Amino acid sequence: MNTAQSALQPEQLTAAGFAPFGIVVEPFAAPGQPGALPPAGARAINGGTTWRLDLTHNLELDHAGGKPGLAVYSASARQFPMALKVLERHAAGSQSFLPLTGARFVVVVAAPGPAPAAAALRAFITTGQQGVVLNPGTWHHALLAVEAGSFAVLERHPSTAGSGADCEFTALAAAVWLALPGADV
């Protein structure tokens, strides 16, 4: 790595840290488990054996004639450190990444608005039990799997030819190096 280039190390993904960019989706204890408390807004279903927490208020999938699209991505593990060169965003809809196989991933994001500078980037590493819902317009890097795994991806798809694709790309002015915690950069 050229030390004159920017270096970015991910922080642990938390709901508070990720709030400007979207929400964190993570498991919580089921009824009857030791210390189990329902998260705020959850309700009991299935005769009290299950807590349900609806997150649909954070999903934007039908803007401008779009419709929900659910896909499964099978991602290879990335090699770190790695150079980040391009970001993307989906201005008309949210995008969710939910690990199906326990694979950790890094999510690199920047606030909606004009194409971001390197200093505006934030990186978060998941536990493998956490997913994210990106707010519409949030700049982000493509999926960065730490371990190979499968992910459910829920996003807005155009419903007709006229409703348009919803993916804009921007090149970073200079490569930003991403390294995992404890790795040499």
Regions found by a protein language model. Give the residues of each.
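Non-catalytic, conserved peripheral segments adjacent to functional cores
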Residues: 1-123, 158-185
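Residues that flank catalytic or metal-binding motifs in active/ligand-binding sites
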Residues: 93, 130, 147
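Conserved metal-binding segment of the jelly-roll/cupin
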Residues: 125-144
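A short beta-strand-loop micro-motif that forms or neighbors metal/cofactor-
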Residues: 138-171
